[in-house]
Amino acid sequence: MNNNVITRFAPSPTGFLHIGSARTALFNYLFARHHNGKFLLRIEDTDKERSTKEAVEAIFSGLKWLGLDWNGEVIFQSKRNNLYKEAALKLLQNGKAYYCFTRQEEIERQRQQALENKQHFIFNSEWRDKDPSIYPTDIKPVIRLKTPREGSITIHDTLQGEVVIENSHIDDMVLLRADGTATYMLAVVVDDHDMGITHIIRGDDHLTNTARQLAIYQAFGYAVPSMTHIPLIHGADGAKLSKRHGALGIEAYKDMGYLPESLCNYLLRLGWSHGDDEIISMTQAIDWFNLDSLGKSPSKLDFAKMNSLNAHYLRMLDNDSLTSKTVEILEQNYNTLLRHLPYREEFGGNTERSTAAYIDIREDASTGLTYKLPLAVELPKKFKISEQEIGYIKQAMPSLLVRSETLLELTRLAQIYLVDSPIIYSQDSKEIIENCDKNLIKQIIENLSELEQFDKESVQNKFKEIAAANDLKLNDIMKPVRALITGMTASPSIFEIAEILGKENILKRLKII
């Protein structure tokens, strides 16, 4: 083990913790932990206009939820500008950089001219070798790197191999802006050196930046960290990952009911493998992770595989843990987890509980993927599940679990057992209720009322008797009964639900018709 290994995750706080960024963080974390090294966190917030505190908090909470704990204090680039300024001035003094007074308007004019001439634009500053004695006093200059005009830069990448870039294709990039703030390129190099980063693992979309950063490394005389640029995650159709493919923040996956252990396992397998192993615990991942097993081709986001893997991890939890997680979600997010249909008083229930929000199900016709997007609405009153309801959910958990791949699906089914809440009827179940034989439902109520034993076998036998007496198939009777009792068209066994909820609750739901 090499305990001198230091990796870093360096997101920009301009939005949520993207799933691709989470995978990058995971790979850096695993590599550091495998070598008993350090995994550092740096927030690249030099873009003051786009960086937000909310995004910083989303990054922190996302990493913590995934279990990717970092070493030491978080580094904020916005607090280190003096360090960057000193570094830029050092290059200036050593003849590796220069003051440039060219106005932005002139640069844009040259860029437009190159575009019109269908030429690749590389800005060549007239101030590169000017004598300081002729510097203007009415213009605030930027500091530019004096990139060598001859030769080339070679990127030694552990995954991509050697990538050679001619110096003539690298511009004299700005290191320090006219207002004295550092650019991304300078800050990254100075920070990686100052933090002692030994290995950089990031997306291959950074590969073009790497050549420019290596030019800065050379100017300073810094040792270059080991570079590994991993292919990006693509959508199921092979296109670059976007929101329509599921390029959501980690918080969204949490809200959709994925477990952190499952998501880490899934992200690990997106571009890394260990033989034929699919189920890999975090402990195993730390033991096994290496850069040699990274794939060179982009991985495709596959929700079916993600769901299947999550179902496996759900089934590894014991009944108490599953019940606790389900109850917690119901209590904290009841208003965003259950599909809403306009409440009708005749459908009964405790009207103090909210039915004011839903999960919006949207299907992308181009990909066939279905997305569940939580819509936040405030609860009018605090929602608290009773001990009796918790008991119902715990008793029903085995049958709920076999029908669920995510905590969201599990919670959706568990709401059947909230006897003090109004039933939330799907549109299909409402249509079944409105079109059903009301006299048949009354007959069912009368027959069930007479039952002394209300276990699932007795209830099932009674329904068979009713079906035979009316010359109907059992399924024909169960459709409206299921809709009335659960608000759904598909659910766990009605006979099991009846046994758990008991006669009084079942009759109450049937009588709302």
From Swiss-Prot:
Keyword Mitochondrion listed: no
Domain RPE1 insert: 335-383
Main EC class the enzyme belongs to: ligase
Motif annotated as 'HIGH' region, chain positions: 11-21
CDD domains per record: GluRS_core
GO molecular function, one term: ATP binding
Enzyme nomenclature, EC number: 6.1.1.17
Subunit field text: Monomer.
NCBIfam families in the record: gltX_bact (TIGR00464), RPE1 (TIGR01045)
Name this protein carries in UniProt: Glutamate--tRNA ligase 2
Organism encoding this protein: Rickettsia conorii (strain ATCC VR-613 / Malish 7)
Gene name tied to this protein: gltX2
